[in-house]
Every structure is written in structure tokens, then in C-alpha cells.
Amino acid sequence: MQFIDQANIILKAGKGGNGIVSFRREKFVPAGGPSGGNGGRGGSIILVADNNLQTLLDFKFKREIIAEDGCKGGPNKRSGASGEDTILKVPCGTEIRDFKTGIILGDLTKNKESLTIAIGGRGGHGNAYYLSNQNRAPESFTEGQDGEIWEVQLELKLLAEVGIIGLPNAGKSTLISVLSSARPKIANYPFTTLIPNLGVVRKVDGNGCLFADIPGLISGAADGVGLGHDFLRHIQRTKILVHLIDSIAENPIHDFEIIEQELRKYGKGLIDKERIIVLNKMELVDDDYLQIITKKLEELSKKKVLAISSSLKKGLSSLLFEVWKRI
């Protein structure tokens, strides 16, 4: 399935139905009074969060959604039927903004949470509404009001508690696959992962914790280079970041600094998030070299640095222990 995490759409609520002009025409009521009914309300457009969805793909080619109009009034003071509301399902974690102003209209983070965006127009009045002592046979009516029109931007931000970040080929997909039941595409070349992979990792008490493997970031990501902003936004909601570094990279220290710099440049509090620094592929380097890299990283980050082997499943208990301590 294609991963779409942004969509711009136009929402048009339904127009209210018109009121009508009508008079009672019954056999024994030769001079019947006004009986024109009111129009029905136009349908509104409501966004509803659905935890079964993981992408905004439904809106890729559906850029304009129009709700149903209300029906006109009827004789004998019958009101027209209201237009049916249009329900749009979106993934949990969808933020809704006014496209023109950028103002946040809502943020749907819980399953079945809803937000009415475009409200349907009110129905018009039929001539029965205008009956008075001064006017016993009104011929006035009003048309239904137009429904609201909104142009909005939908932006999906994943609700994972733990985000796994690092340069391409650091081993993020392998790590999430051994920690959870997720089965991401894995290969020995950069940018294998082009969408965030989600996996539930079980705690000792049986409760699940959602991990997200964020696609490989590169230098300049905060400025939109590579996958850039497309995926940096997904770590905004995480509680913890696991910064994975490839031990066999040409310069692991430089790799660490690249990601730290991108977090700092992107802003929005990313650099202040709790981070666990992890050296991966420890089985492929000798112990002396591993100790040297670990010491340098600890001096730079002012944090404890863990060493693991995702493929051999070494050091994972220590990593999870550090994660659970921070959640």
C-alpha cells in the first residue's frame, strides 16, 4: 500500500433546501391558509479517526468532497429531508489545518474521535412560517443557505511512542523486525525503507508499545533534502528516540553528528527529546575499536551509549530496559 501522509482537500457542505409557497386546497376548506414547509438542512462533513487506517491514500485523487444538499419543503407544512452528513475516515494522528491561514482546526489522536469541519446550510422558510395577523396569505419564502466551504490540509503524524532514527543502512528495519512482529523490507543498500514501519513491542506486563522505524535521514533532511520533511514530522509525537549508528560505517562519529544537526535544524523540540544512542552491528568490529567509538560518542552526547547486534539479537534486553525506564 502506498504511504500518503499529507493531503490538501476542499470540503463543501450541502446547501439547505428551499422553503416553498403552498396553500391548503382541501374540498371543505376553500380558503385554506399557507402550508408551505421549510427546507431541510444541508449535510455537514465530519472527519472521524479510525485506528484501522495508516495512510491518507484515500485523499490522493479525491481532492473535493461535497456533502448532500437538503431537500425543499413540501405542502401541508412538511419540512424537506436533511442532507446526509458525509463521514470521512482518517488515521489516528491526523492534524487538520486551514490551508490558507495554517491555523490548526483539530488534531484527531484517538479512535472514533470526530471533528465537524464544514457545516451544512440551514433550510429556507416556507410561506407557512410567515403567517401573521397582519398577513393571512403570505407568499414569501426563503432559499436555503449555502453550506460552508473549507480548504484544509490533512497531515498525518504517527503516534508511535518510540522512534528509531539514523542514517540509511544503520539497521533500523532489522532492529524493529527482531523487536516486534513487523516485517519491513530489508536489504543491504541505502533507502530500502521508503515509508515508516510500525511494530508493537510487548513489555513484561503484556502491554504493547508502538515503535516506528523512520526512513533514513541524510544531511540536509531538515531543509527537505532526501526524504526530508516528509518523515521528520513523524518523530514529533514520539516520547523517545533511539538513535541507531552503524559501527562499520566509514566514520560513525560523523554519522552521529549529521543526525543530531538535522534534529537541531528542524526545530519543534526534536533536539530536546529523550534519546538513546545505540551502536549497531557490534559483531562486525573488534572490541577495542568498539570501545574507542563508544567513548567518543559518550563524550559528544553526554549520554550512555549502548552496543547491540540486531542480527544476532545481542544487547536488545539492555536497550529495551533503557526504553521502558523512560516511558
UniProtKB/Swiss-Prot annotation:
Enzyme class: hydrolase
Organism superkingdom: Bacteria
InterPro entries, sorted: G_OBG (IPR031167), GTP-bd (IPR006073), GTP-bd_Obg/CgtA (IPR014100), GTP1_OBG_dom (IPR006169), GTP1_OBG_dom_sf (IPR036726), OBG_GTPase (IPR045086), P-loop_NTPase (IPR027417), Small_GTP-bd (IPR005225)
Domain annotation Obg: ranges: 1-159
EC identifiers of the protein: 3.6.5.-
Molecular functions per Gene Ontology: ATP binding; GTP binding; GTPase activity; magnesium ion binding
Main location: cytoplasm
NCBIfam families recorded: Obg_CgtA (TIGR02729), PRK12297.1 (NF008955), PRK12299.1 (NF008956), small_GTP (TIGR00231)
Subunit organization: Monomer.
Alphabetized HAMAP family for the sequence: GTPase_Obg
Protein name (database record): GTPase Obg
